[in-house]
Amino acid sequence: MASVKLASLIVLFATLGMFLTKNVGAASCNGVCSPFEMPPCGSSACRCIPVGLLIGYCRNPSGVFLKGNDEHPNLCESDADCKKKGSGNFCGHYPNPDIEYGWCFASKSEAEDVFSKITPKDLLKSVSTA
């Protein structure tokens, strides 16, 4: 009976040790970030999820990450997203290649004006289909 308990305990510790060693080299995707920071959160393994135009929080990419995009009124992947959410007519993408989405603006000129104050104009990517 004691050997069964000991064997179970050994399996438990071996499993726990396996999971702990996998996370030792993993990047910490926590804290505050800027969508303009490259790489975001200090690691290309993390994503910066904006809560405002200039500030966000670091997270590992996952299904929860994509779900947040649908729920946020200003995050977009296309002009159609902005129109559907009623947040604007133009999706101005962040110049950071690690961020797959943008911010809704009333027009392309408004997006260029805002982003030009933060970063050079030529980095603004347009995904407008119209």
Swiss-Prot record:
Q: What is this protein called?
A: Albumin-1 E
Q: Which domain of life is it from?
A: Eukaryota
Q: What organism is recorded for this protein?
A: Pisum sativum (Garden pea)
Q: Which range is the signal sequence, renumbered to this chain?
A: 1-26
Q: Cite a single GO MF annotation.
A: nutrient reservoir activity
SUPFAM superfamilies given for it?
A: omega toxin-like
Q: What does this protein do?
A: PA1b binds to basic 7S globulin (BG) and stimulates its phosphorylation activity. Involved in the signal transduction system to regulate the growth and differentiation as a hormone peptide. Toxic to various insects through binding to a high affinity binding site in the insect gut.
Q: Cite the entry's keywords alphabetically.
A: Disulfide bond, Knottin, Seed storage protein, Signal, Storage protein, Toxin
Q: Which residues form a coiled coil?
A: none
Q: Which residues form the propeptide?
A: 64-69, 123-130
Modification note: The C-terminal glycine may be removed from PA1b.
Note what the entry says on domains.
Answer: The presence of a 'disulfide through disulfide knot' structurally defines this protein as a knottin.
Disulfides per UniProt: 29-46, 33-48, 41-58
Q: Which Pfam families match?
A: Albumin_I, Albumin_I_a
